[in-house]
Structure formats: structure tokens, C-alpha cells
Amino acid sequence: MINQTIPEDPDWSFYGTWDIEFAYEKFHGKSVDEMLPFVSSCPTSAYGYLAEMPAKPFQYYIQTFVRLLDPTSLEFAECDDKGSAASCFLSLIDYKLKNQPECILPIMDDLIELAKFISTHQSLYEAKIEIFGSFPELFEVLERRNRECLE
């Protein structure tokens, strides 16, 4: 289940990396609601921050993408760059499964249905294949990688 509590200082476990420190400075102490405008306007930057976050912050702030990409949400209706946001979400899942599976596996059940929906509704997200590639093909990779991590 996705973490519903704003991460605290000990959850960030810096390990002395600049990437985590930058993510901390941008996200620390902020709610999902507070971060939605940033993720909506800068999905590629948000991807970069979330990709390097430790488990608890990642498991909390991934909700910004989930909320933004839910086609029934107001945030989705207001998002100007749905294609980039959807591509970043799918790519972020792929990155975490490949590089930090321990961060994402506990919440994969909460993410996989949205990932599948996005992959089968690429046009809804205004994501041209020529620009973003094939979401169905990326979803196949995600499913395979998820299965491999669970074995």
C-alpha cells in the first residue's frame, strides 16, 4: 500500500549524494497536493528527483504522478503535458524496478493497474509514438521486469 504520510528526515537517508539532497530540498515536508503543480508543469524534472529518492519518500511522492495521470481527476484535466507525464511515470517504474526494486516492489500492486491503463490508452495521454515510443511495449518490459524481481 502506498505510504500516506509525508516522509520525515530519517526517511530520506542521505548517503551523501547530491541527488537525494536536491530531492530533499524540493520535496521535504510538502504534501502530494503541494507537489502536484510542480509535477504537472515539470514531469521530467520530477522524474529525476523521484528516481533518486529512498524508499519512503519515493513511495509517498509517486502519488503525485498517480493523481496527475488518473483520467477522472481535475489534475489530469488541467495537465498541459500528459504525454511527458505518462512517459515519465512508466519510465520511472522501469528505472526503479531495474535499479532499486526494494523501493518499488512493496507498492507495485498500487501502480501496475494505472501503468496498464496508460499503456492501453496512449492516445488519451496525447503521447505520440514518434516522440514517446510505444507505451504497450514499455508495459511489456515493466511486466517482465516485475516478474523477474519477484522470482
What residue spans do the PLM features occupy?
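Classical N-terminal secretory signal peptides
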Residues: 1-2, 151
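Alpha-helical solenoid scaffolds in large eukaryotic transport, assembly, and signaling factors
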Residues: 2, 9-107
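Eukaryote-biased recognition of C-terminal alpha-helical segments
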Residues: 109-151
